[in-house]
Amino acid sequence: HTLGFIAGSSVSNFSHRFHNEDVYMPLTPMFHVHGWGFPYMATLLGVKQVYPGRYEPKKLLDLIIQEKVTFSHCVPTILQMLLNENKKIKYDLSKLKLIIGGSAMSKNLAEEARNHGINVVSAYGMSETCPFLTIAQIPSEARKSSQRELIKMRTKTGKPGPLVDLRVVDENYKDVVRDNKSTGEIIARAPWLTNGYIKDKQASKELWKGGYLHTGDVG
């Protein structure tokens, strides 16, 4: 899991490349699924890590500036709180790469984050996938696109990470047609996904029906 996402986030043409010159600070509590992967990546890469304690918008922004934080992740509600606070203090956040998950990031929120200088993209996953399956990417050749097109790219579900086998299937487990119209359930396989639920064999069996983890999400 950790090595897979290090490989995926360290490629040179990836807009959110995570490398040993970054300074990492999580913007979500450690008990949240957001905190289950990146701290291990940061440790393996030898990255400086900052852990804020109380999650107060002003304190988080102060630490980002004081510690020169360059890489983080959070849910949309936390990002909105930071942006609201930064309207008052007007810190330069142009060095910050931020991954958003937990719920969909709206185009308006992404645009507001960009107006504050934050390099923000969406990711998709769930607690059972610990945490990411996919992440939005802006390849180097697309970085001169219009702001409108870039916002679209930033808010997309993105592409599967390394070692992730992702499918969208119908009720018969057949892959749906890729026509931007047909929908089905998102199912996944990867080495780090949960095996099941404690003391709930039936739910665990249903989760992995057909050899894939069933997200219950429509794609």
Q: Can you name each region flagged by the protein language model?
A:
Residues P26-L27, Y51, I99-G101, K156, ...:
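Thr-Gly-centered strand-to-loop micro-motif
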Residues F5-V23, F31-T70, E85:
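Conserved AMP-binding/adenylation subdomain of ANL enzymes
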Residues T157, R178-D179, E185-G219:
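Conserved ATP-binding/catalytic segment of the ANL
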Residues F5, E56, I78-L79, M105, ...:
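Alpha-helix capping/helix-boundary segments
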Residues T28-H32, G125, P191-W192, G210:
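AMP-binding (ANL) adenylation modules
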Residues L44, V69-C74, L83-K152, D165, ...:
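Gly/Ser/Thr-rich phosphate-binding loop
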